[in-house]
């Protein structure tokens, strides 16, 4: 019985260790071309199609991936990005969050934690997550917590990965 319990604890620890470091194993590198994408998105509860190429005409874009709307870490991260919207705007930088959530969920998320300050895009077929190497190692259909700063010439300027939501905003400013 004790051995079985130890095996379960070890397995759980291994699972969460892999989960927390998965972003470091799969991500686009600085200087790489940022894959272009168009996706259904929500801003302040209204839907539209976000087009990365159009956003880049206005300046840099922070493309941040998060696992699931309304979970604790993703809610904190969205609130932090919402609080920093004016700082990003001063730098002529657009922020777009991307997850595998459906657009109805994201309409609510864009009003709640995002405060109507920035858009969130639905990647139902996970093509954007895959193109940006942003899938979790052990659950590739779910986005990892990873942020990219993309320059107007579609190059990756900066990458920040890590499951803690706290540093994504400050590191991408």
Language-model features and meaning:
Residues 1-5:
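N-terminal secretory signal peptides that target proteins for export/translocation
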Residues 142-173:
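Thiol-/selenol-based redox modules, centered on thioredoxin-like
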